A protein has these predicted regions:
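Residues at helix-coil transition
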Residues: 49, 174-178, 206
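Glycine-rich phosphate/pyrophosphate-binding beta-alpha loops
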Residues: 38, 64, 90-97
């Protein structure tokens, strides 16, 4: 491919405090790593086809730590066999009025032959209005400036839903009906691997130690 063998990855994802509060109100034991960074870990393992052998992480203690005992942000370094390294970060620290409707995400992949940089915060599509707009994930929060396309499941327009959730739902229905694995759908093993990595990241953030990650298959 045009990138060649992947040598490093840098990625980050931010939720507003309003979205993070909605998340933790439903799952009191969740963390930025398990709930939010998991998207980055999933993409990382999918893009690279590799699983890390160790995790080192550290986290910030702020509003969410005081109220819920959860870290406000988590930043990690993952090491892989062959020398590949990834730096990932997840934050719940941006204020309620941050213009992303759901999440702000960036993902960069560097290889021997090239690099890819994706800015998935959609800052190129902005709406501003004197009228307040409800956030799609947190409708109780009124926004006057918002980034179109920053709601991860997609957006409603003219009574129809467009975006990733629509495509994933159709793929799931087709897979069940046709008894085949669609290439855009994760497997149970994929989910298990991502959760194992996320738990290792949390363990490192809590202990301050490098956590080895072993794989049996």
């Amino acid at each position: 491919g045009y990138i060649g063998d992947i040598t490093s990855v840098k990625a980050s994802i931010y939720l507003t405090q309003a979205v993070a509060r909605a998340v933790i109100s439903r799952a009191p034991t969740t963390t930025p790593s398990i709930n939010t960074m998991t998207y980055l870990v999933d993409l990382l393992t999918w893009f690279s086809g590799k699983r890390p052998i160790s995790a080192y992480a550290s986290g910030a203690k702020g509003v969410f730590y005081e109220e819920f005992g959860a870290l406000d942000s988590t930043w990690t370094v993952l090491n892989f066999d062959g020398g590949m390294v990834a730096t990932l970060g997840a934050s719940w620290e941006v204020p309620v009025f941050w213009p992303a409707n759901n999440a702000s995400m960036e993902f960069e992949v560097f290889g021997r032959e090239g690099a890819v940089s994706v800015k998935d915060d959609h800052r190129d599509m902005v709406i501003a209005s004197n009228k307040s707009m409800p956030g799609p994930y947190t409708p109780e929060v009124d926004m006057h400036v918002a980034l179109f396309g920053s709601n991860m499941p997609g957006d409603w327009a003219l009574g129809e839903h467009f975006g990733a959730m629509q495509e994933e739902t159709h793929a799931f229905i087709n897979s069940v009906g046709q008894r085949r694995q669609d290439s855009i759908l994760a497997t149970g093993r994929d989910g298990f691997d991502v959760l194992s990595i996320s738990l290792a990241i949390d363990q490192s953030a809590n202990t301050g130690e490098v956590v080895p990650i072993t794989w049996t298959s």
